């Protein structure tokens, strides 16, 4: 049971990808990915060509065990799940979807929103598609700036690091 999450009125849960569903072993992965133009282009080419092993061998990530347990609970409650990822390019879209499918299951739909700033628009669209209010959506994010921004816009958001698993 999740100690500090009230899922009673939640119809949709939306996850961030990097640092939330996918825990990068290299905490400076963005810096290392962009050290040179060649390295950056090679990164995206590898993700496109080898999506099934990209987040295993090239940019290793682990799943969040707390979120894995939460996903199981959400699935049992028939709560719809999405992942909004602020991708510069969509060349690594398949790699991200493959990681999600392998680590969490194939019922989390990945959506690219281009930038962190467009996440609010993504949430609004998901709200419309699912015919639910912001109060019925829970967004889970690791970046505190994004958490604060979304809260200021009326979004029900929690920092992934605040989720506690245990007996209620």
Regions found by a protein language model. Name each.
Residues 20-22, 27-28, 88-91, 116-117, ...:
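Short, solvent-exposed loop/turn segments at secondary-structure junctions
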Residues 1-2:
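Short, basic/aromatic recognition patches
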Residues 63-67, 119-122, 143:
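Amphipathic coiled-coil/heptad-repeat helices and related helical stalk/stem segments
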Residues 7-99:
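Alpha-helical substrate-recognition element adjacent to the catalytic core
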Residues 71-75, 127, 147, 151:
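Surface-exposed amphipathic alpha-helices with a cationic face
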Residues 9-11, 78-80, 132-137, 155:
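Short coil/turn segments at beta-strand junctions that form active-site/ligand-binding loops
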């Amino acid at each position: 049971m999740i100690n500090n999450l009230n899922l009673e009125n939640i119809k949709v849960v939306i996850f961030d990808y990097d640092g939330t569903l996918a825990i990068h072993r290299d905490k400076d992965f963005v810096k290392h990915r962009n050290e040179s133009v060649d390295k950056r282009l090679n990164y995206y080419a590898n993700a496109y060509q080898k999506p099934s092993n990209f987040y295993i061998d090239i940019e290793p990530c682990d799943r969040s065990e707390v979120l894995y347990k939460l996903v199981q609970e959400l699935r049992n409650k028939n709560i719809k799940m999405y992942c909004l990822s602020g991708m510069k390019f969509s060349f690594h879209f398949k790699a991200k979807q493959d990681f999600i499918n392998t680590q969490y299951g194939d019922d989390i739909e990945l959506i690219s929103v281009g930038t962190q700033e467009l996440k609010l628009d993504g949430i609004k669209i998901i709200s419309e598609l699912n015919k639910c209010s912001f109060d019925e959506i829970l967004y889970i994010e690791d970046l505190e700036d994004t958490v604060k921004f979304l809260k200021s816009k009326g979004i029900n958001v929690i920092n992934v690091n605040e989720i506690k698993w245990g007996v209620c």
